[in-house]
Amino acid sequence: MNTTTPIFSKTDSLKFFRTLNSRVNNYFKENNLDRTGNWKLHLKTIVMFTIFLTPYFILLALQMPIWAYLLLNVVIGVGMAGVGMNVMHDGNHGAYSNKSWVNKIMGGSIYILAGNVYNWQVQHNVLHHTYTNILGHDEDLEAGRIMRFTKEAKWYKFHKFQHYYSVFLYGLLTFNWAITTDFLQMKRYLKRNLSYGEFKKPVIRWTTLIITKIIYFSIWLVIPMVLGVTWWKVVLGFLVMHYTAGVILSVVFQLAHVVEETENPIPDENGEIENTWAIHQLFTTANFAPKNWLVNYYTGGLNHQVEHHLFPNISHVHYDKIAEIVKQTAKECELPYYEFKTTRAAIASHFKHLRELGRQPQLA
């Protein structure tokens, strides 16, 4: 991870973001709307937690064949991803509610999804949203040697198969959160004195991490075993749950930034980025299936990543409305607005891009 901070240009001769901000602010003012969540988000919260937790209690209460047990764990995984995208995500961006304590509760749902609030806010809010698609700064591009997400990353022979094995690795996302990622990230972030908001003492961060991990594994592994579920069924179900959630979350994340159209800007020798932060988001981010109601609903507006990156503190329930404002403003300024009409088209572009990145680079 590169610790030299990139510097974005301060020159916006097009006045893109100033114009866009004014128009979006006018939209909320004219329609007398809060920028945070509303009753639609509150209802969706109930729906997503129901999908997530109801199968868990059924598994504890009833004896069932292995196929039914695993199927319910798939449903739990679907609900787990749904809670993460719709509830936890808005909460940790301060976009769920205009009350900070509500945001903390909703953001804290990450603890039963396998993650950690501090780590997520640093990786996502601080690093990813600030340095989007900049190798060495945006950790969403970091997958060790096994995946190559940018042309600047070192190439290995096995990368020519990455568009095949990537799906298997994507399924390990949340499992890794639970087992290793949180511990490695916390050590790294605390060493760099990184924080989103108040910087708390390391002992508080580590204590919170350890206690919440104990609670997490107690809920998903210990309690089912204590109540009589065979240990191997519990472990297998745990893996199925995580694989399901991991694939869903990874694919949704990748469709926003690792596709053919999006760019990976490189800082110059002075560490400077060519564009302003807002214009940088347009070049590095893409939407998909913006008119698909089900995709909009389930992904928590993460199919409107352009709007999310420009306005991370606005709840996703508003993205479909402000999207036209963003699109029109970008068009007027002759700036890109990347968008795939369908999820299928975005997925195809992602895996085609992985295949291209897996080819051996030609020597200059």
Provide a role label for each language-model segment.
Residues 63, 91-95, 185-188, 227, ...:
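Membrane-interfacial segments
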Residues 253-277:
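C-terminal, non-catalytic macromolecule-binding modules
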Residues 3-26, 175-189:
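Short, charged cytosolic
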Residues 75-201, 269-361:
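Membrane-embedded catalytic scaffold of the fatty acid hydroxylase/desaturase
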Residues 21, 25-43:
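Membrane-interface, cytosolic juxtamembrane amphipathic helix immediately N-terminal to a transmembrane helix
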Residues 5-7, 33-40, 91, 106-111, ...:
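Glycine- and acidic
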Residues 36-84, 111-112, 163-175, 200-252:
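Alpha-helical bilayer-embedded segments of polytopic membrane proteins, i.e.
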Residues 241-254, 258-259, 326-336:
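C-terminal, active-site-flanking charged/polar segments
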